[in-house]
C-alpha cells in the first residue's frame, strides 16, 4: 500500500504540467466516453440495485438512470470550461524591502475521497481532481461496487490515453481503506461523504485532516411577514422534491401568529405526498383534522435527519426563538427564512452559523452545480478550509511566490 501511494504522490507532478487546454480536453473526453457507454453503466447499476435490499434514501442515491448519467456528463462539460484555478495569483504586493510577494493557488496534493452510494461521484470527482491538478484515491461504498467499477474503468481509459493513470486509484475493500487511514505522511486530506457514523469512524482512526460533510439537518423558518403562497412553494420544494438528499428540509419552524393559516395550506399538499409529521406539542392541534400520520415530537425529533417524506414541525414566537432553535439543533448545512421583514432576514443570516443561509429560497440549491461550480466534491459543514458546496477552488490551497533583487534582512 505504501508503495502504491508513494507512486501516486510522485506521479501527481504530471498533473501540474497540464495546461488549461489539456485539462479541458481530458474532461471533455471523459464526458464523451461516459455518454457513449451509458448502457454499460446502467447494466452495472442494475446489479447493484438488485443486490441492495434496503429501501429509502440510500437506494435513491444508488440509482442511476439515463437521465442522471446524461446530467452527469453535462456537469463534467461545465467543469471542463471553468477557469483553471492552478497558478492563479489572488493578490500581490511589495513589502518595505522591495520584495515582490504574490499569493498563488496550488493543489492540495493527494486527496482521499470516501463515499457511500452516489456512484456518479466516481466520475464527477475525477473531473474536479483533474481540473485542480490533485491526485486522488477513491473508496466507494460496497453497495455501489459494480457501478463504481464500471465508471472508473471508463475513467481509467481516458487517464491512460493521457498517461495519467498513475495519479489515481480506486479501492473497493473495507480493509484497504483502513490501511490508507494510516498514511498521514502521504495523504494530504480526506473528504468523507456518507453517514455520520461513517465519518466518525474515519475520524477516530486517522491523523489525516478531514473536511467533513455532516448530515443535512436543514431548517426553514416561516416568519410572520412571509408571503404564504411563496412559503408554501418553497417548503414543498425543499421537503418533497427529493427527500434522500442532504439539502432537503427536515425541520419546519412557523411563527405562531400565522400557524393556523399556513398549516391549513400545507396539509392538502402534504397529503398528496403522505408526509409524516413529527410535531412539537405546540403544533399538534393544527394537524388534528388532517389525513396525515402525526407523531408527537420526542427528545430526539429535532436532531433527526429523516431522509424520507417526514418533517419535524414546531411553532416559535419570533425570529429570535427560531435562530436559537436552529443554532442548537443544526448540523451546519443549510437553513432558510421566508420573510418580508428585512431586519429579521439580516438577523437570521448574521446569527446562524451554518454554511448556507437562504432568504426566500429553497435549501435545495445547496449544490455545486446549482452554485455554478459544475460539480462538487462535497458540501462541507466544517469551519476550517472550506464551507458549503466544495467546487474546484475549495480543493486548492496556496503558496507565496517571493521575488527579490538581492535583498537581505537587516
UniProtKB/Swiss-Prot annotation:
GO cellular component, as recorded: cytoplasm
Keyword vocabulary terms for this entry: Amino-acid biosynthesis, Cytoplasm, NADP, Oxidoreductase, Proline biosynthesis
A GO molecular-function annotation: NADP binding
Described function: Catalyzes the NADPH-dependent reduction of L-glutamate 5-phosphate into L-glutamate 5-semialdehyde and phosphate. The product spontaneously undergoes cyclization to form 1-pyrroline-5-carboxylate.
EC number(s) on file: 1.2.1.41
Pathway: Amino-acid biosynthesis; L-proline biosynthesis; L-glutamate 5-semialdehyde from L-glutamate: step 2/2
UniProt name for this protein: Gamma-glutamyl phosphate reductase
Subcellular compartments: Cytoplasm
First-tier enzyme category under EC: oxidoreductase
GO BP: L-proline biosynthetic process
Reactions mediated catalytically: L-glutamate 5-semialdehyde + phosphate + NADP(+) = L-glutamyl 5-phosphate + NADPH + H(+)
InterPro entries assigned to the protein according to its UniProt record, in alphabetical order: Ald_DH/histidinol_DH, Ald_DH_C, Ald_DH_N, Aldehyde_DH_dom, G-glutamylP_reductase_CS, Glu-5-SA_DH, GPR_dom
Primary location: cytoplasm
HAMAP family in the cross-refs: ProA
Encoding gene per record: proA
Amino acid at each position: 500500500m505504501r508503495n502504491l501511494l508513494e507512486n501516486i504522490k510522485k506521479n501527481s507532478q504530471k498533473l501540474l504540467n497540464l495546461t488549461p487546454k489539456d485539462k479541458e480536453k481530458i474532461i471533455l473526453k471523459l464526458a464523451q466516453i461516459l455518454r457513449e457507454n451509458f448502457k454499460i453503466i446502467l447494466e452495472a447499476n442494475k446489479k447493484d440495485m438488485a443486490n441492495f435490499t434496503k429501501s429509502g434514501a440510500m437506494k435513491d442515491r444508488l440509482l442511476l438512470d439515463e437521465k442522471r448519467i446524461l446530467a452527469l456528463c453535462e456537469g463534467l462539460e461545465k467543469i471542463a470550461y471553468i477557469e483553471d484555478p492552478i497558478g492563479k495569483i489572488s493578490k500581490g504586493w511589495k513589502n518595505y524591502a522591495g520584495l515582490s510577494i504574490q499569493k498563488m493557488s496550488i493543489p492540495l496534493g493527494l486527496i482521499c475521497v470516501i463515499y457511500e452510494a452516489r456512484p456518479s461521484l466516481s466520475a464527477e470527482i475525477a473531473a474536479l481532481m483533474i481540473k485542480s491538478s490533485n491526485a486522488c484515491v477513491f473508496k466507494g461504498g460496497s453497495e455501489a461496487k459494480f457501478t463504481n467499477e464500471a465508471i472508473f474503468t471508463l475513467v481509467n481509459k481516458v487517464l491512460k490515453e493521457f498517461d495519467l493513470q498513475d495519479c489515481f486509484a480506486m479501492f473497493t475493500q473495507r480493509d484497504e481503506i483502513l490501511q490508507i487511514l494510516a498514511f498521514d505522511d502521504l495523504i494530504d486530506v480526506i473528504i468523507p461523504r456518507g453517514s455520520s457514523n461513517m465519518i466518525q469512524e474515519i475520524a477516530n482512526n486517522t491523523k489525516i485532516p478531514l473536511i467533513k460533510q455532516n448530515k443535512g439537518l436543514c431548517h426553514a423558518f416561516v416568519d410572520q411577514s412571509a408571503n404564504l403562497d411563496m412559503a408554501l412553494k418553497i417548503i414543498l420544494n425543499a421537503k418533497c422534491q427529493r427527500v434522500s438528499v442532504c439539502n432537503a428540509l427536515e425541520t419546519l419552524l412557523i411563527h405562531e401568529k400565522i400557524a393556523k393559516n399556513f398549516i391549513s395550506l400545507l396539509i392538502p399538499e402534504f397529503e398528496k405526498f403522505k408526509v409524516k409529521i413529527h410535531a412539537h406539542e405546540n403544533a399538534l392541534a393544527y394537524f388534528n383534522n388532517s389525513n396525515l400520520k402525526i407523531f408527537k415530537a420526542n427528545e430526539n425529533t429535532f436532531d433527526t435527519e429523516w431522509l424520507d417524506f417526514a418533517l419535524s414541525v414546531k411553532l416559535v414566537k419570533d425570529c429570535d426563538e427560531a435562530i436559537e432553535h436552529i443554532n442548537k439543533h443544526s448540523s451546519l448545512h443549510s437553513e432558510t427564512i421566508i420573510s418580508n421583514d428585512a431586519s429579521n432576514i439580516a438577523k437570521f443570516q448574521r446569527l446562524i452559523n451554518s454554511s448556507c443561509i437562504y432568504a426566500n429560497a429553497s435549501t435545495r440549491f445547496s449544490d455545486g452545480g446549482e452554485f455554478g461550480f459544475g460539480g462538487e466534491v462535497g458540501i462541507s459543514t466544517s469551519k476550517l478550509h472550506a464551507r458549503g458546496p466544495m467546487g474546484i477552488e475549495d480543493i486548492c490551497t496556496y503558496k507565496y511566490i517571493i521575488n527579490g533583487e538581492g535583498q537581505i534582512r537587516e
